[in-house]
């Protein structure tokens, strides 16, 4: 943390990853309103940070302001699959160059995802194996490709380089695996990310059963006014379990939620709700993990669960 930002006169390009959360406790503006980019990328809009933006309208307004911050004659690379993003782009300034993107062409073979673009000047279709998977990741890669294109990086250069990209930290992080089992943990906690992450794992391993755990840990996810945003988000999992710690709610000084509220909000009758982390360990120990994957999603730690130990035990169990 000694050097969180470094700017030099010799750098011709500066890349910032920022979001709509507050710049600091004393500067209540969203971080991304301070950047004034020449090239902006907008990947999607899904309501979050209810403690700062209590209504969806107030949340959406920040993204409108973000687009307005783009420099004169700048570029906006945006995901056209997101209806909220599309609606904002329609009303963007006329001097802004609009560059849409969506899910690229790909295929999955033997648990590996390949990008399959048609590159100009090549006889055969390109085939690029990736270390990441899931349509949300592939869509983001496509957006990154178009940003790179604006600064002179060719598509072929991008595709060759992206095959070594291991993904963002704490996103679909492989904890353990055996020939017929895989255990992933992921930072997903917002409804859209939970849904996308579960769908990614299920699509990558369609023949395997998937058990997915989600810890409600953030202020938004534990707020009764936000819980309904999670409706249907875990439906793709074969077994879905939500965990929350009532003591965390007390610590955050928000109104308590009940197991019944959680189950109703997720709109899945078979959903299980745990409030004691010991129940998680017991559940995992009682399952058969042959041809069966485990996914654990949280911005926290499931109250200190030892992921590495669980992974090692499950691998031994499946050998």
Language model regions located:
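Short gly/ser/thr-rich secondary-structure transition/capping motifs
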Residues: 1, 18-26, 58-61, 100, ...
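Acidic, Mg2+-coordinating active-site environments of NTP-dependent enzymes
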Residues: 15, 36-183, 207-208, 260-264, ...
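ATP-dependent carboxylate-amine ligase
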Residues: 39, 64, 90-97, 143-319
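Switch II of P-loop NTPase G domains
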Residues: 21-36, 192-200
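Conserved phosphate-binding catalytic cores of ATP/NTP-utilizing and phosphoryl-transfer enzymes
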Residues: 1-6, 137
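Switch II (G3) loop of P-loop NTPases
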Residues: 13-25, 183-189
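Short, glycine/acidic-enriched loop or turn micro-motifs at the edges of active sites
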Residues: 20-22, 46-47, 82, 188-190, ...
């Amino acid at each position: 943390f000694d050097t969180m930002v470094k700017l030099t006169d010799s750098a011709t390009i500066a890349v910032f990853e920022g979001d709509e959360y507050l710049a600091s406790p004393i500067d209540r503006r969203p971080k991304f309103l301070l950047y004034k980019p020449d090239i902006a990328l907008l990947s999607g809009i899904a309501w979050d940070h209810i403690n700062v933006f209590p209504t969806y309208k107030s949340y959406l307004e920040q993204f409108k302001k973000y687009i307005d911050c783009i420099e004169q004659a700048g570029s906006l690379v945006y995901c056209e699959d997101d209806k909220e993003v599309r609606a904002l782009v329609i009303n963007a300034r006329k001097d802004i160059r609009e560059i849409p993107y969506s899910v690229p062409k790909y295929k999955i073979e033997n648990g590996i995802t390949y990008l399959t673009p048609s590159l100009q000047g090549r006889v055969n279709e390109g085939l690029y194996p990736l270390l990441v998977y899931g349509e949300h990741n592939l869509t983001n890669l496509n957006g990154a490709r178009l940003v790179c294109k604006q600064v002179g990086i060719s598509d072929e250069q991008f595709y060759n380089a992206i095959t070594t990209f291991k993904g963002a930290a704490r996103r679909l992080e492989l904890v353990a695996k055996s020939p017929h089992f895989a255990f992933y943990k992921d930072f997903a906690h917002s409804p859209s990310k939970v849904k996308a992450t579960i769908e990614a794992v299920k699509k990558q391993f369609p023949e395997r059963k998937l058990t997915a755990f989600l810890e409600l840990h953030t202020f938004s996810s534990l707020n009764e006014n936000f819980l309904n945003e999670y409706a249907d988000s875990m439906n793709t999992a074969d077994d879905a379990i939500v965990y929350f710690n009532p003591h965390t709610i007390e610590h955050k000084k928000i109104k308590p939620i009940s197991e019944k509220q959680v189950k109703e909000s997720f709109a899945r009758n078979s959903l299980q709700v745990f409030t004691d982390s010991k129940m998680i360990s017991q559940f995992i120990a009682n399952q058969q993990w042959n041809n069966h994957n485990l996914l654990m999603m949280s911005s926290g730690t499931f109250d200190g669960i030892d992921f590495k130990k669980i992974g090692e035990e499950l691998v031994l169990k499946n050998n």
